Curated annotation (Swiss-Prot):
Gene Ontology CC terms, in alphabetical order: nucleus
Listed name of the protein: Lysine-specific demethylase JMJ15
Organism: Arabidopsis thaliana (Mouse-ear cress)
Binding site for Fe cation: 307, 309, 395
Miscellaneous field: Plants over-expressing JMJ15 show early flowering phenotype.
């Protein structure tokens, strides 16, 4: 990573890939067949006034140039630059020269044939406008059209229902965001260029305006009274409209091509939210605009107004193609300063609409902010570059011409404190949240418990989570802070409530929110036997009624004692760690459907071999996790049920104990369609005198089931079916060497360290003699090797937190 400096910023600015200045060839002038009354004919009433430009005199945001090696791990790089960049609110990241992902939007099928909606923006009214007589229901409207989680019903597979339509213009949207006409990208490019050519037309015809000249004119329009400046913006375009600019897809796994690095990279925004280490992986619902990227198609002066990300998340924006995008950022530490300054200078607008900043319809001068003591920094983003925004960092900006960008949110572990702060602010403002912070927090804690319990294998994953544990670990401190907060609130409610264990499915099918402040109720909820028949609940800060105490109750997912034990487990207390490992194993399917494994996806090479997964899923692929394919070397098993011990020769072998009723879940190639990845459920049932029967079932098609007396044979049968289907679909014989073998024990989960430890805990008396004899023999050999080599590292494999596990 090259350190940045003032000189670095200047050098970068001088050598940026800003589109070259060209002469304003008006060859298209007069060829536009659209009549002046057509919505596809830009109305240009104002003209460039360079003599009165208002370019703000502010500092530049830092620019980073990762090496190819640094660029390999997206979240690690963000963590690396955070101490240098967070105090600016935003930063620019210029990828290595070998990063040049093709943009799928440029194919004729999309560029010329797919329409997208636009929104009208009156740029001259984004700051200077009078109040509009309207009322907005307080706290009932989420920014950027992200629907309330109670309004958008979840499908059984966790995605947001497609029945919810794109928000339409209403009478409330009187400035900045009324609906505009639909365009193809090809037509919008011409519309945008016609507008820019007309607006900046010069008598001398010397060339296009520079970024600096456009910026000066933009702020003249914002700050000074001027003629109407009306532009269009294709903003917040959800995935089904145009899809992603990044390629994603699956292909026959035996083929390889040069696209793999772009499809599997964490810098592909389709993968970012689900990367190992991203806390958003613990939110099983696919939230559009948060985990699923949105596209933005801009033209000159089209604007994104001052805002912070939902739940104070990070955001990462990639500029696919076109003219530059100018950003402004305010560090999160000065967020309240920006809010105070805007309220001071725009009192009428805030009096009428206190939540004005949530609506993204108000721009505000960086010059005024600077004069009010609020630091503002600029970043000019060119095609092929990223802009990263930090938690609670207000940001805004505009486009210099026709371009296309894509953005998504991300939550590294350090976001936890910011997310909790956002929850408290949203509660005070009675504003709905996009995420269940408690669900994410518990998901991270459970992942940490599993990683702390692992030993001897999977070191990379274990160490990546272990560093967030311990007494001063980020996850430990976040759980402890949440525990103390909940403890005080329950005490404040008094003794008039009975404590009731929350059903594990309390919020599985619908999101529960406090009727008073809209806080998420995943961890706890207050209710009343008389009133809760209406499915109304409150948080531990609010009573929902004034009924008698005997009728009121508090649902607790975990008691205060259990949460205290979780804190101790994260600090490394072995007894608490074992207890929580058991809880995590039992409840894993409910709390960790958003598995934090890395996503590795494959690109199509020829059309007939692969589906395009950027648009809406068709029926056959709706159940699978589209655009993802596993790494054959790194199966990730999700335990569902641990089962119970049956002592007997057939219920173990020298490698594993086989609990009756054990059940797990893993992704593998679909036997019906190997170009898709689907979930399989592996389970162990009691076959009477025959002992355990191992069974593997395709989750989406229960008829596809494979049973045998060994886990190895079960999964070999699955593999054989996959290979047969691949051969059947191929016009010629395929090379299937990648699928020649499979490890049945690993696919069941019996090589996962935390599953091994949990099954061993079922047999404290070592009744499964064959398994324990082999384990003791193996451990003795390891200890002998350890003694001979004097290697403390090898010795540690037989111990966990100083406790002998033999």
């Amino acid at each position: 990573m090259e350190p940045f400096s003032a000189a670095q910023n200047k050098e970068d600015k001088d050598t940026s890939v800003e589109p070259p200045r060209r002469r304003c060839h008006r060859k298209n002038k007069g060829t536009n067949v659209e009549p002046p009354s057509s919505p596809y004919h830009p109305k240009v009433l104002a003209r460039w006034d360079p003599a009165n430009e208002k370019r703000p005199d502010i500092g530049e945001a830092p620019v980073f140039h990762p090496t190819s090696e640094e660029f390999e791990d997206t979240l690690a790089y963000i963590e690396k630059i955070r101490p240098l960049a967070e105090s600016f609110g935003i930063c620019r990241i210029v990828p290595p020269s070998n990063w040049s992902p093709p943009c799928r939007l440029k194919g004729d099928s999309i560029w010329k044939n797919k329409n997208f909606p636009t929104r009208v923006q009156f740029v001259d009214l984004l700051q200077n406008r009078g109040p509009v007589k309207k009322k907005t229901p307080k706290g009932r409207k989420r920014k950027r059209g992200k629907y309330s989680r109670t309004v958008a019903p979840k499908k059984r597979n966790g995605s947001v229902s497609k029945s919810v339509s794109t928000p339409k213009a209403t009478e409330e949207e009187n400035f900045g965001f009324e609906s505009g006409p639909e365009f193809t990208l090809e037509k919008f490019e011409k519309y945008a260029q016609d507008f820019k050519d007309s607006y900046f037309e010069r008598k001398d015809n010397v060339g296009d305006p520079s970024v600096e000249e456009i910026e000066g004119e933009y702020w003249r329009i914002i700050e000074k009274e001027t003629n109407e400046v009306k532009v269009l913006y294709g903003t917040d375009l959800e995935n089904p409209i145009l899809g992603s600019g990044f390629s994603k897809g699956v292909k026959i796994p035996t083929r390889r091509n040069d696209m793999d690095k772009y499809i599997s990279s964490g810098w592909n925004l389709n993968n970012l939210a689900r990367l190992q280490g991203s806390l958003l992986s613990f939110e099983d619902c696919e939230i559009s605009g948060v985990q699923v990227p949105w596209l933005y198609v801009g033209m000159c002066f089209s604007t994104f107004c001052w805002h912070v990300e939902d739940n104070h998340l990070y955001s990462l924006n990639y500029h696919h193609f076109g003219e530059p995008k100018v950003w402004y950022g305010v560090p999160g530490s000065h967020a309240t300063g920006l809010e105070k300054a805007m309220r001071k200078h725009l009192p009428d607008l805030f009096d009428e609409q206190p939540d004005l900043l949530h609506e993204l319809v108000t721009q505000f001068s960086p010059t005024i902010l600077k004069n009010e003591g609020v630091p503002v920094y600029r970043a000019v983003q060119n095609a092929g570059e990223y802009v990263l925004t930090f938690p609670r960092a207000y940001h805004s900006g505009f486009n210099c011409g026709f371009n296309c960008a894509e953005a998504v949110n991300v939550a590294p572990v350090d976001w936890l404190a910011h997310g909790q702060n956002a929850v408290e602010i949203y509660s005070q403002e009675t504003r709905k949240t996009s995420l269940s912070h408690d669900k994410i927090l518990l998901g991270a804690a459970f992942e940490a418990v599993k990683s702390l319990s692992a030993h001897g294998e999977d070191n990379t994953k274990r160490f990546s989570w272990k560093r967030f544990c311990g007494k001063d670990g980020i996850i430990t401190k976040a759980i402890e802070a949440r525990l103390r907060m909940e403890e005080k609130r329950i005490e404040a409610l008094g003794n008039g409530f009975s404590l009731v264990k929350m059903d594990k499915d309390f919020d599985s099918n619908c999101e529960r929110e406090c009727i008073s402040c809209f806080s998420d109720l995943h961890l706890s909820a207050t209710g009343c036997k008389n009133c809760s028949s209406l499915e109304e609940y409150g948080c531990t800060k609010h009573d929902i009624c004034s009924c008698e105490g005997k009728d009121r109750f508090i649902f607790l997912r975990y008691t205060i004692d259990e949460l205290s034990s979780l804190v101790r487990a994260l600090e490394g207390e072995s007894d608490d760690l074992k207890a929580w490992l058991s809880k995590v194993m039992e409840g894993c399917s409910e709390t960790q459907k958003g598995e934090s494994s890395g996503i590795i996806v494959k690109e199509k090479q020829v059309q007939e071999e692969c589906f395009d997964l950027n648009g809406e899923c068709n029926k056959s692929s709706e159940i699978c996790e589209d655009a993802s394919i596993m790494d054959l070397a790194a199966y990730h098993v999700e335990p569902i049920n641990l089962g119970f011990l049956v002592v007997g020769k057939l219920w173990c072998n020298k490698h594993a104990i086989f609990p009756k009723g054990f059940k797990s879940r893993v992704k593998f190639y679909n036997v019906q369609d190997p170009m898709r990845i689907s979930y399989y459920v592996s389970e162990i049932v009691d076959a009477g005198l025959l002992g355990p029967l191992f069974k593997v079932t395709l989750e989406e098609s229960q008829d596809e089931s494979f049973s045998y007396a060994s886990p190895q044979k079960c999964w070999e049968m699955v593999l054989l079916r996959v290979k047969e289907e691949i051969m059947r679909r191929s016009n010629q014989k395929q090379d299937v060497h990648m699928l020649e073998s499979i490890d049945g024990l690993k696919m069941f989960g019996f090589r996962s360290p935390f599953i091994v430890q949990a099954t061993e805990a079922l047999d404290p008396n070592h009744g499964q003699v064959e398994y324990w004899n082999h384990k003791n023999e193996k451990d003795s050999l390891e200890m002998k090797d350890c003694f001979m080599s004097n290697s403390s590292q090898s010795l540690s494999k037989a111990r966990l937190f100083g406790v002998d596990l033999n």
